[in-house]
Amino acid sequence: MKTMIAWLVLLTFAAALCFADEGLKQEHMNERKKSRFREDIPDEISEDLLLQEMEAMEAELLEKEMRMEENRNSREKRCLGEDISCGEKPGDLVRMPCCAKYECKETAGYWWYQKRFCVKKKSG
């Protein structure tokens, strides 16, 4: 019975401490809010500052969006990938270029196929 009472006292103490800690956290948050939005600055000035910050953020986002759109429009439209005949001989009908990371070369099977193929550029 004595141990049950001791455990109940300990549980009550822990619960009270927890609620007291939550109250301190709430007070701390209120103090931070007050310090962040000082009352000595008039409302009009704080609204103007907020408006300027939002306009700057909007301009930055619009600039990023324009750059993304330029990148989308400037990408390669049609090109040939790896191991596709690129046909750079004058008599060939297919004249599409290889993609940027490939080059048109005579591969090991050139003697048989008589065609060039797009292969990866060597990075060395």
From Swiss-Prot:
Q: List the disulfide bonds.
A: C79-C99, C86-C104, C98-C118
Cellular location of this protein? Secreted
**What tissues is it present in?**
Expressed by the venom gland.
Q: Which GO terms describe its molecular function?
A: sodium channel inhibitor activity; toxin activity
Query: Where is it chiefly localized?
Result: secreted
- Report keywords, A-Z: Cleavage on pair of basic residues, Disulfide bond, Ion channel impairing toxin, Knottin, Secreted, Signal, Toxin
Pro-segment residues?
A: 21-78
For whether the record's keyword set contains Secreted, the answer is yes
Q: Name one GO cellular component term.
A: extracellular region
Residues crossing the lipid bilayer are none
Signal peptide from the UniProt entry: 1-20
Output the InterPro entries linked to this UniProt entry. Answer: Toxin_22
Q: What does this protein do?
A: Ion channel inhibitor.
Q: What is known of its domains?
A: The presence of a 'disulfide through disulfide knot' structurally defines this protein as a knottin.
Homology family: Belongs to the neurotoxin 14 (magi-1) family. 04 (ICK-6) subfamily.
Q: What is this protein called?
A: U12-barytoxin-Tl1a
The organism encoding this protein is Trittame loki
**Upper classification of the organism:** Eukaryota, Metazoa, Ecdysozoa, Arthropoda, Chelicerata
